[in-house]
Amino acid sequence: MAIIYLILLFTAVRGDQICIGYHANNSTETVDTILERNVTVTHAKDILEKTHNGKLCKLNGIPPLELGDCSIAGWLLGNPECDRLLSVPEWSYIMEKENPRNGLCYPGNFNDYEELKHLLSSVKHFEKVKILPKDRWTQHTTTGGSQACAVSGNPSFFRNMVWLTEKESNYPVAKGSYNNTSGEQMLIIWGVHHPIDEKEQRTLYQNVGTYVSVGTSTLNKRSTPEIATRPKVNGLGSRMEFSWTLLDMWDTITFESTGNLIAPEYGFKISKRGSSGIMKTEGTLENCETKCQTPLGAINTTLPFHNVHPLTIGECPKYVKSEKLVLATGLRNVPQIES
């Protein structure tokens, strides 16, 4: 049928030339291409969104997790100033200030911290699970605290952790394990205390030359405390070093220590995964909803590209750095007379 149609078409045409294409018009609209500037076209349509509403909104009806003056570390460890975050509902994304003041109240560091933040970009809810109850450590003192983490003027400590110290001038080997039967991966955090001198070491743990050993089917980590003189931070010359791991389903994590162990009381079951992220912002949640959020504000558009901010969460156009992006159609506007 197609062959017959073409034959009929050609037999119906009179003249010595057939032109198939757009009809040139008198448009003066020009665009810049990768190879050439000021190319004249018949039509150009803007396909780049440049605006936002300046607000932090719920994403598809789900509010973000507002950390306020707390950092990621302060939230997960349980800084006493972050008590409102001890139990949090599902979040769409996380709002963290550039320099939150409530992080590690007891000075130190958090190993692989950026990797932990990257993990949070695919998590939308944690369920706290008590894995090593405080009262299981019957041969050790579990009320260790510091004025650096004070509550109402009294020494305190990270709510989700247990600082094990000597009991009745004795520190026997501390052993504890947890088998993950939760049905999901679990985030486990622990710490090692690094005293300022040997006197502090003996006062807290009786023993010297101590170790902290942590093991799973994929992890074998043994740490020894580093006793050293350091500048004081929050009034302390000693430090705490925190580490984390993901415990797979049905795997077991085991702790063994002769001193300096900061044991986890709680683990964090990853109860819901999904696209999330951490928005670095000084803003607060407003009464609005969106499908696409950036740290600068929400985007509401049907255009395929935007240049608002490289970090987006939700159903968003593709980010480009360009200041202008258009879709050009039609032939170059150069009218020509054909005989």
UniProtKB/Swiss-Prot annotation:
Key words of the record: Clathrin- and caveolin-independent endocytosis of virus by host, Clathrin-mediated endocytosis of virus by host, Disulfide bond, Fusion of virus membrane with host endosomal membrane, Fusion of virus membrane with host membrane, Glycoprotein, Hemagglutinin, Host cell membrane, Host membrane, Host-virus interaction, Lipoprotein, Membrane, Palmitate, Signal, Viral attachment to host cell, Viral envelope protein, Viral penetration into host cytoplasm, Virion, Virus endocytosis by host, Virus entry into host cell
Domain of life: Viruses
Glycan-modified residues: N25, N26, N38, N179, N180, N300
InterPro entries reported in the protein's UniProt record: Capsid_hemagglutn, Hemagglutn_HA1_a/b_dom_sf, Hemagglutn_influenz_A, Hemagglutn_influenz_A/B
Cysteines joined through disulfide linkages: C57-C288, C70-C82, C105-C149, C292-C316
Protein's cellular compartments: Virion membrane; Host apical cell membrane
Cellular compartments per GO CC: host cell plasma membrane; membrane; viral envelope; virion membrane
Topology in membrane: Single-pass type I membrane protein
Assembly with partners or alone: Homotrimer of disulfide-linked HA1-HA2.
Family statement: Belongs to the influenza viruses hemagglutinin family.
Job description of the protein: Binds to sialic acid-containing receptors on the cell surface, bringing about the attachment of the virus particle to the cell. This attachment induces virion internalization of about two third of the virus particles through clathrin-dependent endocytosis and about one third through a clathrin- and caveolin-independent pathway. Plays a major role in the determination of host range restriction and virulence. Class I viral fusion protein.
Miscellaneous comment as given in the Swiss-Prot or TrEMBL entry: Major glycoprotein, comprises over 80% of the envelope proteins present in virus particle. The extent of infection into host organism is determined by HA. Influenza viruses bud from the apical surface of polarized epithelial cells (e.g. bronchial epithelial cells) into lumen of lungs and are therefore usually pneumotropic. The reason is that HA is cleaved by tryptase clara which is restricted to lungs. However, HAs of H5 and H7 pantropic avian viruses subtypes can be cleaved by furin and subtilisin-type enzymes, allowing the virus to grow in other organs than lungs.
Protein known as: Hemagglutinin
Species whose genome carries this gene: Influenza A virus (strain A/Ann Arbor/6/1960 H2N2)
Name of the gene: HA
